Amino acid sequence: MSRIGNKPVEIPSGVTVTVNGADVTVKGPKGELKRTFNPEIVVKVEDNTVVVERPSDKKEHRALHGTTRSLISNMVEGVSKGFEKSLELVGVGYRAQKSGQKLVLNVGYSHPVEIVPEKGIEIEVPSNTKVTVKGIDKERVGAVASNIRSVRLPEPYKGKGIRYEGEYVRRKEGKTGK
């Protein structure tokens, strides 16, 4: 990870990065993100870039170096562009619809499944078989999308279920009768 850690993070116009000890705050047109990093890793703002430095070449410092740089890069990208994850529902009668802020999924259970998005996460339903999760925090967008997918995981025999857009579902042969 040390090669990634050595790359500086470019700060686009309209985005400000503030470092206060181990706390890094990133403000942009879409919102504000704050995160506390390991105090051993040094984060500096120089000109229009964020530079991450490690104290030594120990294995744990090398790993934290790259991780910290990637997390800061995702924070900068999130407040400037935002993140989006798309899911598709595959199966006869599988539908998604929005009811206020809640997402209501009809995916073959005896009852509709309701999902309430957490603060800062927006769920859109462009069609009744597509769901889009949007937000500025990459980690939370992925977690909400994963929770929606876990309601009905894609099964290998008919491919029914909720899957990420473009996800390949490995199919299996059914049993052959005698």
From Swiss-Prot:
Family to which the UniProt record says this protein belongs: Belongs to the universal ribosomal protein uL6 family.
Keyword Ribonucleoprotein set for record: yes
Keywords, ordered alphabetically: Ribonucleoprotein, Ribosomal protein, RNA-binding, rRNA-binding
Protein name: Large ribosomal subunit protein uL6
Organism this protein belongs to: Halalkalibacterium halodurans (strain ATCC BAA-125 / DSM 18197 / FERM 7344 / JCM 9153 / C-125) (Bacillus halodurans)
GO cellular component term of the entry, any: cytosolic large ribosomal subunit
Subunit and interaction comment: Part of the 50S ribosomal subunit.
A family per Pfam: Ribosomal_L6
SUPFAM superfamilies found in the cross-reference section: Ribosomal protein L6 (SSF56053)
Gene (UniProt): rplF
Taxonomic path: Bacteria, Bacillati, Bacillota, Bacilli, Bacillales
